[in-house]
Amino acid sequence: MPHLSSASRQRLDGAHPLLRELFLAVADKAAIEVLESQRGRSAQERAFALGHSRAHFGQSAHNWSPAIALDVVPAPLDWTDLPRFRALAALVKDEAKLRRIPLVWGGDWARLKDMPHYELDPWRRFALEARLVDG
């Protein structure tokens, strides 16, 4: 069984079943922490105001239930250790490919590099089967 903190497990429980499957498999192979899954209106607008997101509420894959995006980091977390983020991303992408889970990593984005961010692709298609998060 994967080792995840209770907080990471709770966040993962709010994610789309494909993301849960993927990151449970990843947790069997690497130490990870799930920082965020669902993000309500106030949290999304705060992230936008702080420059941590370019999306207003309803325009982010985090704003849906089940969550269509997760923020996942290598554990223990060291924001300055970018090679560990890249190594985790390689593992996540390999697992996603193996499982045929369509995925985008925020570290591959041209403008705002979002190293912890993983989302189902295309997330707006998955949003058609979800609902906006309350709050």
Annotate each language-model stretch with its function.
Residues 1-33:
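Active-site acidic/histidine clusters and adjacent loop/turn architecture
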Residues 3-7, 53, 73:
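Generic alpha-helix detector with strongest preference for long hydrophobic helices that associate
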Residues 8-12, 43-51, 93:
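Short linear motifs at secondary-structure transitions and domain/linker junctions
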Residues 15-17, 51-55, 100:
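Short amphipathic alpha-helical surface micro-motifs
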Residues 17, 21, 42, 87:
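Short, well-structured alpha-helical interface segments that form or flank functional binding sites
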Residues 23-52, 98, 104-106:
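Extended, low-complexity, intrinsically disordered C-terminal regulatory tails
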Residues 55-135:
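Catalytic cores and adjacent binding grooves of peptidoglycan-active enzymes
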